[in-house]
Amino acid sequence: XIGAGATSKLVY
C-alpha cells in the first residue's frame, strides 16, 4: 500500500 508517516507503516 501506500506508505504514510515516517516509516510507511500506515496504509491507506
Curated annotation (Swiss-Prot):
Cofactor: Ca(2+)
Gene Ontology MF terms: calcium ion binding; phospholipase A2 activity
Activity sensitivity to pH: Optimum pH is 8.0. Stable between pH 6.0 and 9.0.
Name of the protein described by the UniProt record: Phospholipase A2
Signal peptide residues on this chain, from the entry's feature table: none
Any Gene Ontology biological process: lipid catabolic process
Enzyme Commission number, as recorded: 3.1.1.4
Keywords attached to this entry: Calcium, Hydrolase, Lipid degradation, Lipid metabolism, Metal-binding
Superkingdom of the organism of origin: Eukaryota
Temperature remarks: Optimum temperature is 50 degrees Celsius. No activity at temperatures below 25 degrees Celsius or above 60 degrees Celsius.
Family stated for the protein in its record: Belongs to the phospholipase A2 family.
Organism: Carcinus aestuarii (Green crab)
Cofactor binding: number and manner: Binds 1 Ca(2+) ion per subunit.
Transmembrane segment boundaries: none
Catalytic activity: a 1,2-diacyl-sn-glycero-3-phosphocholine + H2O = a 1-acyl-sn-glycero-3-phosphocholine + a fatty acid + H(+)
